Amino acid sequence: VQLVNWGFNAWAKYDNYARDSRIGAFVESHTGLSRSEPQRHDGTGRVILEGGGIETDGRGTMLVTEEWLLSDVQVRNPGFTRADYE
């Protein structure tokens, strides 16, 4: 088991989420599990995703909708295309 510490930007709506970025390190330090932080290909930080937007089965399958991931209204990863996510 490994922690996946996605980036978070408060649904691209709010500015007060700075403390949220520390939760991955906190969970890692209290569980002893290793943590990975998927990085953007342009080197600007972690890939932004949030719970509820993705579903996984723990065996390599992930479900997500294009409407959520590629939203022009709530941009999670500016400049990312469908191919970047795939």
Residue ranges and their predicted role:
Residues 1-86:
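The feature marks the mature, well-folded catalytic cores of soluble enzymes
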